[in-house]
Amino acid sequence: MNILFDLSGCNQPYNAITVYGLRILAGFKENGYKDISILCDARIYDHVHVTFPEYPCLEIAFDTGRNPMTLLRNFRHWKNTVKNIEHDVLFVPHVFPPNFCFHRRDKTVLVLHDLQGLRIYKGLRLWACRFFYPLALWRCKASIVISDFVREDVRKTYPFISPRKLNTIYNGVVVDQLPQKRDTLPVKGKYLLYVSSLMEHKNVMTLLRAFNRLKDKIPHTLVIIGKTRPVWTEKAL
């Protein structure tokens, strides 16, 4: 079975979705699976090609801009490129960009990370989520969800989507490959570590309030690592 990994929607090598896709690829590589091709944005091509030299890696460059004509040109470019790549399964690690919604549904496996776009976005981005989340789930052959919570959220939000399409596969991390450098940490003693983007829906404020209640009862320091957001500087600090 030939799998086409569609990373064309990832334009930064250390973006969360890119990292997720590359971890999946690393798992296939470690288990000796060979029938894989990778389609990736020109901006991450070198990174992906160097990381996985054993897999054919095809570069695709999109026009910049968000006007309708640009989006249409990019979709046609993507469609023609994918059509010319032999594959049995198209693996898509994220709903956006939703080019795959107009691909053959019997070939597409989608990863749905959550439905937070329905709750945190406004305006055009919110309407895009409202339209493409259910369309993507309807058009794909199968969907991977990263937790049972997400699976139940999908079932409640879109009861018309068959639960047989939704397959829970948790995110994985190879712990043995993580470097152990405790002596270089700026924090001494015990600590609680939070790593994620500092967005409001991540509930960092609740974490801070909870730690504030416990800080005099436990010996731990709270360490927070993440990309700063306006809510962080406005409320937390």
Model-identified regions with their sequence ranges:
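Carbohydrate transferase catalytic cores enriched for Leloir-type hexosyltransferases
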Residues: 1-237
